[in-house]
Curated annotation (Swiss-Prot):
SUPFAM superfamilies: Trypsin-like serine proteases
Gene Ontology process terms (BP): proteolysis
Enzyme class: hydrolase
UniProt-listed Enzyme Commission number(s): 3.4.21.-
Molecular function via GO: serine-type endopeptidase activity
Signal sequence, renumbered to the chain: 1-36
Protein location: Secreted
Active-site positions on this chain: H75, D113, S193
Keywords: Hydrolase, Protease, Secreted, Serine protease, Signal
Descriptive protein name: Serine protease SplB
Domain of life of the organism encoding this protein: Bacteria
PROSITE patterns in alphabetical order: V8_HIS
GO cellular component, one term: extracellular region
Length: 240
């Protein structure tokens, strides 16, 4: 795929933050009838890896990349500020890994939809392993790479409010990897923005940000592929 396709297609993509208002109904109707590979599993236990690496915003998803540090999309973090809260791997009304306050937001300087968020180490509301963020979550490690045909999974909180913060895992094949773009055929919905894109070993290959708004067999989902430059930016902004 030409690396410009994703950029030029933004007008026809769903930016996958759960929102209310104009456009939401259209997106939901399209996604309910999508023909993209629809291998979606409801996660029963979020207190085991890889699910302990995922966090929920009120309208989107993020994941842990290091000490007190999570990753999401710029189009997610722009709606948040220092002092706002995130919840570690909630499992609807069955508990969570604690609630934490945002202390710093750092956006990637390039065009890629990547944002680092640091949180306060001590929880506002404790998780099952106490008040320390790092005791209640598990950071992801990077994959060596990814290529077309490999299987990936996207883990996140589609329609988090509507679905009462139930975690879902969607799987499918990689369609292409070029530059900082990874394209895959996996069913995603509003709220999946910021979800980790993982290989079969639960290693990070990218971060999810959008999907096509169309109803045919070629409907794809899009992520930012973790290039060395993006990995370097993330490493430099892990909380010390």
């Amino acid at each position: 795929m030409n690396k410009n396709v994703v950029i030029k297609s933004l007008a026809t993509l769903t930016i996958l933050t759960s929102v209310t208002g104009i456009g939401t109904t259209l997106v939901e109707e399209v996604q309910q009838t999508a023909k993209a590979e629809n291998n979606v599993t409801k996660i029963q236990d979020t207190n085991i890896f890889p699910y302990t690496g995922v966090v929920a915003f009120k309208s989107a998803t993020g994941f842990v990349v290091g000490k007190n540090t999570i990753l999401t999309n710029k189009h997610v973090s722009k709606n948040y500020k220092v002092g706002d809260r995130i919840t570690a791997h909630p499992n609807s009304d069955k508990g969570n890994g604690g609630i934490y306050s945002i202390k710093k937001i750092i956006n990637y300087p390039g065009k890629e939809d990547v944002s680092v968020i640091q949180v306060e180490e001590r929880a506002i509301e404790r998780g099952p392993k106490g008040f320390n963020f790092n005791d209640n979550v598990t950071p992801f490690k990077y994959a060596a790479g990814a290529k077309a045909g490999e299987r990936i999974k996207v883990i996140g909180y589609p329609h988090p409010y509507k679905n009462k913060y139930v975690l879902y895992e969607s799987t499918g094949p990689v369609m292409s990897v070029e530059g900082s773009s990874i394209v895959y055929s996996a069913h995603t919905e509003s709220g999946n923005s910021g979800s980790p894109v993982l290989n079969s070993n639960n290693e990070l290959v990218g971060i999810h940000f959008a999907s096509d708004v169309k109803n045919d067999d070629n409907r794809n989902a899009y992520g930012v592929y973790f290039t060395p430059e993006i990995k370097k930016f993330i490493a430099e902004n892990i909380d010390k």
